[in-house]
């Protein structure tokens, strides 16, 4: 069975509920249930439930049994990956949500804000390739109080994020992003993606990322690299002369004693070509 469990935060509860349905509907001749979870149409993990052990747990035939004793999580086999047929691998999609930008302690006014709609639209060509876009529509703000967009001080580093005022005081409706993305599973526990286009409000370019993430491990490792150019704040599609190569090698750690916390350490080159 292929899908993505999002209803229950407790993984064991989700596995148990699905397992009870399968145990009641499928014949006892079936000895294993395979629940293959996917993310972005890429099979990520196979939860293998031992049917006989689960039925004993579900009927309380074994005292003090735990649902964790009835299943194991492994990387999907290549056969399972090849057999995966997404319910909707192609087609258009659209969504809209509110955004709210705010800053405190500005020279013009203590509190400045911008409220609007971020509309996302795209088209999936297959389970790996898609084109994605975003349009920002400002509904209410007080950014007209700005009496400057870029300060007059000399900067040691190239101005990248310090030009943000030029980008948020443009037309009411702006093109936020338009890019193509390919993502896939490279091998067991290895995943990658590549992308290109207008990647964010201030920069566009091409890039890619590869990640090693073992099933249920506390650690993961990734590397990303991008070549980007700064977008012209006075134009919807034009770029400025400034360009940079940016990227990082990152390590991720999720400690057992803080299960809802992820720690990340990265080293690499930033947009202003400084390193750290």
Language-model features: locations:
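Gram-negative outer-membrane beta-barrel proteins
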Residues: 41-43, 102-108, 139-145, 188, ...
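Histidine/lysine/aspartate-rich catalytic loop segments that bind and position anionic ligands
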Residues: 223-236, 242-246
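Short, conserved, surface-exposed binding loops centered on an aromatic residue
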Residues: 211-213, 241, 253-257
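Conserved mixed alpha/beta catalytic, RNA-binding, or beta-rich assembly cores of soluble enzyme
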Residues: 211-214, 223-225
